[in-house]
């Protein structure tokens, strides 16, 4: 079996390590506990969180015990890492609600019922929330020199623009997390994004000062980049969320299927559990026959199934095929709802007579009745994927998909959705 560190190295998943030889020796001798933290800054995790989540999963598959730490306390403070300005503070009730949602999402990726190495879910509010300010300053704060903290990138990058004491103290709170998990869960490794290096090394320093003969390690993963220079995980519609109510499985699938040839092999290494041989085979196919997009198809399948399940993946493929071929009628009402999310729509009475010309004008697909008639005559108008060329056409019950939707298209890309009361 490939050593976990060798597998991570092949995948390009190690940005920095505090002590590579020491960590390798530890992993050779014993199964360890490790953690990564997730602050509830929204009501869902997004694909930027996938790498650390999958890192925990990789270690669990290798026999180690992952700890997913939800930042119920640190989420109330705000991490300055990578931020140019102060975060807006959220209230306790919202953070508690978001923490629960994130817990539920994490349970889809980690096995909390495993016999030998079940994952652990922790919330740092359980220890930070109970600590009074005197204990915090005497027992924890005294271990941190101001010059040491000012030298950290997360702080130094904000000195000119300004940083509050609240965010300045975030590093200490995260360090306290590592110390608490080290003491109570024998956690010896923290994993985080490359922007967390300063916070991780601060935690190691606190452990070293607080515990005799301490052995603890830190490892960061790279920032995910795109070859075209745009930000990974963002589209015109915003962030790609792991919650299907915020980003549908179809939208999620489309994000991955549209991966640039220059990025696809890297993402296969980062986001899938395919073997080295399978990835190298897909890399060769991308090189020799890029038009077939086999690597993109496999990437989209692996990640969509991982996040949303096999059924949602198959639905996403079905929607994609229907939209590509124009065969809208073969979609179910649920698939239409998912596939045309965000498309302009109009709700009408089922009993209404709906002349196609009037619908084109009401929907603003055509600017006038005259233009609408011209569009129909020229064969530019489609109802559920079927071309309509009769200007006297009236939409009937037969044009409703499961009685709920009619999809109107003008030209190649202008869609409109009719829904029925």
UniProtKB/Swiss-Prot annotation:
It catalyses: tRNA(Tyr) + L-tyrosine + ATP = L-tyrosyl-tRNA(Tyr) + AMP + diphosphate + H(+). It comes from the Bacteria. Belongs to the class-I aminoacyl-tRNA synthetase family. TyrS type 1 subfamily. It is found in: Cytoplasm. GO terms for cellular component: cytosol. This is Tyrosine--tRNA ligase 1. ATP binds at residue 234. SMART domains: S4. It is an enzyme of class 6 (ligase). Residues 354-420 form the S4 RNA-binding domain. The lineage of its organism: Bacteria, Bacillati, Bacillota, Bacilli, Bacillales. It comes from Bacillus licheniformis (strain ATCC 14580 / DSM 13 / JCM 2505 / CCUG 7422 / NBRC 12200 / NCIMB 9375 / NCTC 10341 / NRRL NRS-1264 / Gibson 46). Catalyzes the attachment of tyrosine to tRNA(Tyr) in a two-step reaction: tyrosine is first activated by ATP to form Tyr-AMP and then transferred to the acceptor end of tRNA(Tyr). PROSITE patterns: AA_TRNA_LIGASE_I, S4. One of its GO terms (molecular function) is ATP binding. Its main location: cytoplasm. Keywords: Aminoacyl-tRNA synthetase, ATP-binding, Cytoplasm, Ligase, Nucleotide-binding, Protein biosynthesis, RNA-binding. InterPro entries: aa-tRNA-synth_I_CS, aa-tRNA-synth_Ic, Rossmann-like_a/b/a_fold, S4_RNA-bd, S4_RNA-bd_sf, SYY-like_C, Tyr-tRNA-ligase, Tyr-tRNA-ligase_bac-type. Its EC number is 6.1.1.1. L-tyrosine binds at residues 35, 170, 174. A motif ('KMSKS' region) lies at residues 231-235. The keyword RNA-binding applies. GO terms for biological process: tyrosyl-tRNA aminoacylation. The keyword RNA-binding applies.
